[in-house]
Amino acid sequence: TGLMVRPPKAGESSYALYNAEREGILSSLRARSRKLVEALNKLEGIVCNEAEGAMYVFPSIKLPDRAIAAAEAAGKAPDVFYALELLESTGIVVVAGSGFGQREGTYHFRTTFLPPEADMDGVIERMSSFHADFMGKYR
């Protein structure tokens, strides 16, 4: 915590290393965030804003009526149903938006962009493939 409370200042011996590490981490997070948001916005029924000061994004998802009906038949909130299907199909964990007090009739999920940069393409591909299959199944 000391480093966060009092980071090295310009002129101190550790400043250059600290600044390079910090900028490298932040740059990587920005790149992963942009890549994920861009990919999510290409998916049917998903709208995702850029992350602002967080390590997650919170896309909205328009679920087909048949998916909503299947969720209700299973006794689950529609976004929970989607999140569980995603987990079971891909191993990817997202948090259903219904736990955050979303507006009635809207659906969201929260997902991070913390996987290593080298893994992001694979995560995005698995998520995109699942989403296309899910939408096709319930459309």
Language-model-detected regions and their locations in the chain:
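PLP-dependent class I/II
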Residues: 1-139
